[in-house]
Amino acid sequence: MKRSFLNVFCAVAILAAIILTLAACGGDKKGQTTAAFDAENAFSRLLSEVKYAETLSDTSSSADFMFSDLPQNAEIKMYTCESGSHPDELIMMKGAKEEDVQALETAAKTHLTELTAQLRDYNPQEVPRVENAVVCTNGLYVFVCVTDDVETTKAILK
């Protein structure tokens, strides 16, 4: 009983952290990217300026497997740790239209929840990194960044 309560409490805490992150980093509500925001440039900066546990590799070719429920014509770029021993990753999803953004945000939240559950079983010391992931929406774009370098990530996505 005590373990079930702890699992429920942790799940609620994770969801609350994700929701607060989304609220703090949300873009405009009409799905339009602000003129000052260049998503491709932000992605490049996130790759080069943010500190990750190890080198990230382009794993975009496996993104369809991890995100099978994305809206039609959604685009995704995904970089993950080469060895797979750390959860650090950078994901940029782009919806084809404004209505896709909510589905992309849901996919991002679901991905982080599933990643947290996996880590609890085999690498629990990495769970806080995922719980503190930055999820940011700007226009048609949704970014997910799992790293300890949260401040740099937020500054780039601002």
Predicted segments, located by residue:
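Short, compositionally biased low-complexity segments enriched in polar/charged residues
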Residues: 55-87, 100
